[in-house]
Amino acid sequence: LSFEGLPPFGANDRESAQHLQDSLNRAKFLLAFSTSVSPAPYTHPTKEYITGRWTDALASGVTGVGKVPNTTTVREILWDGATIDIDHADARAGLAQVADAAARWTPAQGEQQIRQALQHLDWRHRFVELCKALGEVPTSLTADCEAMRAQYVQR
């Protein structure tokens, strides 16, 4: 196992985002923990939620490892294999779980994460639902979603 830690900050937001993407492109797993077990001053003190850390990782083909937020929404949008819950209270046990997952990892797992993220997390799906509720879905949005579907079917 190797651990990279946080990507470096860039001179501007664009550079920082590129460092993050480069880091995710090298990763197989990303450690992330629900606020229920890892509170921080910049998170909600009582609410659990899935953050951009989880969704960006999944969209990059990376499996989330840690403690997933226990909410109805998270259970609805995530798929089997999107995340691996590990023992957050015992670092040795948690690392053993990560080592086991790393030993079983295949490139197909990363491809599956990307495919599933396109199907479940892409905002265009939500825009379609909003537009339907308003009575009309723009043809460009429909075309985008059809192209996306073709992409995740072909992967």
What are these regions (language model features)?
Residues 1-78, 123-126, 137-140:
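Nucleotide-sugar donor-binding catalytic core of glycosyltransferases
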Residues 9-13, 89-94:
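A short acidic, often aromatic-flanked loop/helix-cap motif at beta-alpha or helix-coil junctions
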Residues 12, 49, 86-87, 118:
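Pocket-edge positions in alpha/beta enzyme catalytic cores
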Residues 68, 87-88:
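Active-site proximal loops enriched in glycine and acidic residues that flank catalytic Cys/His/Asp
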Residues 79-87:
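A short acidic/histidine/glycine-rich donor-binding loop in glycosyltransferase catalytic cores
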Residues 84, 92-155:
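C-terminal amphipathic helix plus adjacent low-complexity
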